[in-house]
Amino acid sequence: MADDGHEMTDGGHDHAGVEFEGADAPTVALDVTADPAGGINVFVETTNYVVAAESASTEHVEGEGHFHLYIDGEKVLRFYNEAVYFGGVTEGDVEVMVELSANDHSTYTLGGEPIVAMTTFTVPAHSHDDHSHGDPEPVVFEGDAPTLEVTVEPDPKSGYNAFITLDGMVLSAENASGDHVAGEGHLHIYVNGQKLGRLYGPATHIPVLPDGDVEIRVAAYTNDHMVYVDGAGDPIEASTTVEVG
């Protein structure tokens, strides 16, 4: 099962910069790899920086914040994990930039310059269809099945934030779309049964939801995108319903 091309996009530009005033300024570095199923995986490393998903869109606290992902100068995602998948790229050179954002979405600056990491990545040709065809085959999780919970809260600025608790499974962004390794994998998130994205960590921003009672479901998948099931054959997943509007 491959990912849709433009998942969880969060375009536009946010607030002006906020100068970091402390002695130990944050740093950010990034690495980009081609995902075997299409798209790219972006890996982020920081120092002196706390990703605070629960404080997103609230008052500025120095040293806290989240990430913004830009592709060719356009903001496409707000994200909270140190690895993120993005499918909305095509073959050729793309400029990938990760920006350190404060809780209130101001860009962190140092000496007046934004604190960012940037690289140009050549997206390889991808010859087969990136979209899924039918349901993936289930894989029985070896040993005790992991536990999975999800809660969803309105974001004070826009959209919603989903918070996931997972115990007993290794989230392995570096092996996504690779060979199956027992106990490893990633998560898929769904809105009313429609796949929204692939997750490598415990929190994600959902830019918009339809009005009404909306089901948010998170499910565990193998590295090669097969659904994990427990010994009884039931999918390892969690869901919650959000009233929107």
Regions found by a protein language model. Give the residues of each.
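Short beta-strand segments within Ig-like beta-sandwich modules, predominantly Fibronectin type-III
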Residues: 74-81, 194-201
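Short, flexible loop/turn segments at beta-strand junctions in immunoglobulin-like
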Residues: 86-90, 206-210
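Short acidic/polar inter-strand loop motif in beta-rich domains
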Residues: 101-109, 221-229
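Short amphipathic, basic-aromatic surface patches that mediate peripheral association
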Residues: 46-58, 166-178
